[in-house]
Swiss-Prot record:
GO terms for molecular function: ATP binding; ATP hydrolysis activity; four-way junction DNA binding; four-way junction helicase activity. Its EC number is 3.6.4.-. Residues 192-262 are annotated as: Small ATPAse domain (RuvB-S). Belongs to the RuvB family. The gene is ruvB. It comes from Herminiimonas arsenicoxydans. This is Holliday junction branch migration complex subunit RuvB. Has 3 domains, the large (RuvB-L) and small ATPase (RuvB-S) domains and the C-terminal head (RuvB-H) domain. The head domain binds DNA, while the ATPase domains jointly bind ATP, ADP or are empty depending on the state of the subunit in the translocation cycle. During a single DNA translocation step the structure of each domain remains the same, but their relative positions change. Mg(2+) binds at T76. The keyword Nucleotide-binding applies. It comes from the Bacteria. Homohexamer. Forms an RuvA(8)-RuvB(12)-Holliday junction (HJ) complex. HJ DNA is sandwiched between 2 RuvA tetramers; dsDNA enters through RuvA and exits via RuvB. An RuvB hexamer assembles on each DNA strand where it exits the tetramer. Each RuvB hexamer is contacted by two RuvA subunits (via domain III) on 2 adjacent RuvB subunits; this complex drives branch migration. In the full resolvosome a probable DNA-RuvA(4)-RuvB(12)-RuvC(2) complex forms which resolves the HJ. ATP binds at L30, R31, G72, K75, T76, T77, E138, D139, Y140, R181, Y191, R228.
Length: 352
């Protein structure tokens, strides 16, 4: 019996993307509503607090804002917080949904003064829709075509001032003209275990799941620096604690639940180990090209780049080089394998 790798990757308990519509609904219930409730991303939060306060005092729309970074770090949450802090409405859509210029025009013409338009996956906007967006962002105007053939004519419509908040995991795929029209650009970073501990503690309170600090930290340190994963693991650990114990989440209870879920102490699951083992044992530590690596583990190259690699690189287990991916000494140590004295390129580890 064959296993579809796409289905398998979607079922990962430590996947940074929402697993279902039900999970998205739970996420909405757990989201902070205001900046002072938002944990982590201190630099971005401080900047937004100043920019939002200034825009509110001037009674102007906030500058167009681009939020980028790996999935699950809070881009959608920040978009909702921006709208709430500005005291305006939020209209939400995504790049793939806006197939025709008319789809975007309908959204823009229904915005009220200073409203927030949130476009997720903005890097996937079609070129036709993107062209319509440029004058809307700069001049709050759009040009639409009325009629067809020789009788067709262009009509310019004035829009209310608004704020576009774009979110993307692939900032490099944005066109330069679109990127240049954002006045505020913020990169979201992975969270520290202490920040995630605060998030887990807050979420457990909202879920009425008793948890101690050690239990929260045990979940946090295995959450790959990602709040979405932390909240998902918390819900699974809560289930385990209610069935196997009295419902209280302690360090021992959290550890037992996470072992059952096959999430190891650094947050790796079978897919992470599969990737690192391929680099270490199939390709002798690398360098290995992305296409070869994708074929070796049966995953799409986009999944490797967007989902698997960011955390492995950030934690120092994997390194990107011009010649391909290579395993670091940290990866060798994690699997209990002696690292070679020289790197895969024949250079000493740690050398220039």
């Amino acid at each position: 019996m064959s296993i579809q790798t796409d289905d398998f990757s979607e079922q990962r308990v430590i996947a940074a993307t929402p697993a279902s519509a039900n999970e998205e609904a739970i996420e909405r219930a757990l989201r902070p509503k205001q900046l002072d409730e938002y944990v982590g991303q201190e630099k971005i939060r401080g900047q937004l607090e100043i920019f939002i306060t200034a825009a509110r005092q001037r009674r102007e729309a906030l500058d167009h804002t681009l939020l980028f970074g790996p999935p699950g770090l809070g881009k959608t949450t920040l978009a909702h917080i921006i709208a709430r802090e500005m005291g305006v409405n939020l209209r939400q859509t995504s790049g793939p949904v806006l197939e025709r210029a008319g789809d975007l025009a309908a959204l823009l013409t229904n915005l009220e003064a200073n409203d927030v338009l949130f476009i997720d996956e903005i890097h996937r906007l079609s070129p036709v829709v993107e062209e319509i967006l440029y004058p809307a962002l700069e001049d709050y105007q759009i040009d639409i075509m009325i009629g067809e053939g020789p009788a067709a004519r262009s009509v310019r419509l004035d829009l209310q001032p608004f704020t576009l908040v774009g979110a993307t995991t692939r900032a490099g795929m944005l066109t330069n003209p679109l990127r240049d029209r954002f006045g505020i650009v913020a990169r979201l970073e992975f969270y520290t275990p202490l920040e995630l501990t605060r998030i887990v503690t807050r979420s457990s309170s909202l879920l009425n799941a008793p948890i101690d600090e050690d239990g929260a930290f045990e979940i946090a340190k295995r959450s790959r620096g990602t709040p979405r994963i932390a909240n998902r693991l918390l819900r699974r650990v809560r289930d385990y604690a209610e069935v196997k114990g009295n419902g209280d989440i302690t360090k021992a209870m959290a550890d037992a639940a996470l072992v059952m879920l096959d999430v190891d102490p650094v947050g790796f699951d079978v897919m992470d180990r599969k990737l690192l083992e391929a680099v270490l044992f199939k390709f002798n530590g690398g360098p290995v090209g992305l296409d070869n690596l994708a074929a070796a583990i049966g995953e799409e190259r986009d999944t490797i780049e967007d989902v698997l690699e960011p955390y492995l690189i950030q934690q120092g287990f994997l390194q990107r080089t011009p010649r391909g991916r290579i395993a670091t000494p940290v990866a060798y140590a994690h699997f209990g394998v002696t690292a070679p004295q020289t790197g895969p390129n024949g250079e000493l580890w740690g050398g220039q």
